[in-house]
């Protein structure tokens, strides 16, 4: 096992006042594998600017400018993140969503009616 020592000990990250985070399950549950580069960039931006509840609001024009993409690409990219289950969007609000225990559509197993109703009761689809 590799012993991890900081390469730049004087620059160890500290939790900032406006703390945001990326859930490790983004990688371990393969959500990131389902994202285009544009979607990963938009997700990183939204996670960075979100408040404690994952909420933010930026206009399509501003996001497109900040991410150097046209508005059509931004809309397609936003829809991609919604379909994957990483964000919710209702103009003008974005919400970075909690990552499900199992990625949506990745179980490959049948669900009982009880499981489906349980998920619906938790606000999942």
Model region roles, listed by residue range:
Residues 30, 42, 57, 88, ...:
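Intrinsically disordered, low-complexity N-terminal regions enriched in serine/proline/glycine
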Residues 26, 46, 67, 85, ...:
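Generic low-complexity, intrinsically disordered sequence content enriched
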Residues 102-125:
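Short, amphipathic alpha-helical interaction segments positioned at domain boundaries
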Residues 24, 33, 65, 76, ...:
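Charged/polar, solvent-exposed surface patches and flexible loops
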Residues 1-54:
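Short recognition helix of helix-turn-helix/winged-helix DNA-binding domains
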Residues 37, 49-102:
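Winged helix-turn-helix DNA-binding recognition segment
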Residues 19, 28, 78, 93-97, ...:
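Short, structured secondary-structure boundary patches
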């Amino acid at each position: 096992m590799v012993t991890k020592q900081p390469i730049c000990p004087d620059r160890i990250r500290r939790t900032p006042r406006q703390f945001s985070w990326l859930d490790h399950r983004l990688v371990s549950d393969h959500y990131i594998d389902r994202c285009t580069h544009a979607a990963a960039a938009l997700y990183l931006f939204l996670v960075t600017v979100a408040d404690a509840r994952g909420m933010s609001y930026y206009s399509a024009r501003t996001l497109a400018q900040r991410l150097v993409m046209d508005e059509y690409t931004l809309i397609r990219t936003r829809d991609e993140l919604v379909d994957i289950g990483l964000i919710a969007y209702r103009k003008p609000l974005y919400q970075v969503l909690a990552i499900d225990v199992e990625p949506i559509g990745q179980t490959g197993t049948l669900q009982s009616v009880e499981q489906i109703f349980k998920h619906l009761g938790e606000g999942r689809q």
